[in-house]
Amino acid sequence: MTVLIHVLGSDIPHHNHTVLRFFNDTLAATSEHAREFMVAGEDNGFTESCPALSLRFYGSKKALAQAVIAKAKANRRQRFFFHGQFNTSLWLALLSGGIKPAQFYWHIWGADLYEVSHGLKFRLFYPLRRIAQGRVGGVFATRGDLSYFARQHPGVRGELLYFPTRMDPSLNSMAKERQRAGKLTILVGNSGDRSNEHITALRAVYQQFGDTVNVVVPMGYPANNQAYIDEVRQVGLALFSAENLQILSEKMEFDAYLALLRQCDLGYFIFARQQGIGTLCLLIQADIPCVLNRDNPFWQDMAEQHLPVLFTTDDLNEQVVREAQRQLASVDKSGITFFSPNYLQPWHNALRIAAGEAE
């Protein structure tokens, strides 16, 4: 039997760390198909912190792609599970036959599915990537992303799967210590990445609430982002008074980030695609409602779990926010499909499907 190989095809340290730790701590002990990884980027201590995994690192996305293609050609029974897919060479290999459809199983992370970049090289590449995506052996994704993907590629098998957000189920029923009263605190975006459209979001928040709310913007990740942080701060200070605007430019440890989220009353995410599911989960767990773009298909996942959804096009005010908080507080969090530990069984199923052991 050929063991499934997992591929992290782009050097995205935060996401790669989450995936590797999840496999090491949760999946590797029960499945031989959860132990082999090919990773773009440096080791950064992963080998030491994930002893249950066999990890091979590659200095560039191209080097990793070449290694994957060589393995795929050497053994056509070898199957790969691609987690996210931000590697042009791998898509082209699927198009050219270097990797066969039956070898290629893909967990959609959101950004790798949608065509939102306006750069010329992206606009030229998107049609090719779209054709390649129709040739994969199967996809795993959120409910909303499965729906989006199926409209373009109805013949490709799709299975529900959620990114393994680090969550403590014991916090599901823990009431917030502070009383929900007074000035609202609004979280804008889930990172410092430009895909959060911070400037557009800040203007939208100001249009809805004016300078009457506290605005928190976490921008400590990714690194080397100071010019964009300064740009966001300049626009933010033109809209909000200094005491109402908090732009966080330093990377935060998980516990500190969790504490920050629990001080908020509302999450505001203006981007028109599925992303930031980890932050959304942690907010929902703390009875903090989220405002989504209506074009972000994750609202379908939330509605399926009977969670209140607010949209950027809604008329928002404190009364609306407090009512959404009340509705969230009445939901039994232990039954939410995309919460830990409920997302575990779909992962076991995904491993068997990608490995060819399940129909």
UniProtKB/Swiss-Prot annotation:
Name under which the protein is recorded: TDP-N-acetylfucosamine:lipid II N-acetylfucosaminyltransferase
Family that this chain belongs to: Belongs to the glycosyltransferase 56 family.
InterPro entries, alphabetized: WecF
Keywords for the protein's UniProt record, in alphabetical order: Cell inner membrane, Cell membrane, Glycosyltransferase, Membrane, Transferase
Gene designation per UniProt: wecF
SS bond partners: none
Reactions that this protein is recorded to catalyse: beta-D-ManNAcA-(1->4)-alpha-D-GlcNAc-di-trans,octa-cis-undecaprenyl diphosphate + dTDP-4-acetamido-4,6-dideoxy-alpha-D-galactose = alpha-D-FucNAc4-(1->4)-beta-D-ManNAcA-(1->4)-D-GlcNAc-undecaprenyl diphosphate + dTDP + H(+)
Main location group: membrane
GO molecular function: 4-acetamido-4,6-dideoxy-D-galactose transferase activity; fucosyltransferase activity
Cellular localisation: Cell inner membrane
Source species taxonomy: Bacteria, Pseudomonadati, Pseudomonadota, Gammaproteobacteria, Enterobacterales
This enzyme's EC code(s): 2.4.1.325
Annotated GO biological process: enterobacterial common antigen biosynthetic process; fucosylation
Membrane topology: Peripheral membrane protein
Pathway recorded for this protein: Bacterial outer membrane biogenesis; enterobacterial common antigen biosynthesis
Function: Catalyzes the synthesis of Und-PP-GlcNAc-ManNAcA-Fuc4NAc (Lipid III), the third lipid-linked intermediate involved in ECA synthesis.
Main EC class the enzyme belongs to: transferase
Organism: Salmonella schwarzengrund (strain CVM19633)
A GO cellular component annotation in the UniProt record: plasma membrane
Keyword flag Cell membrane: yes
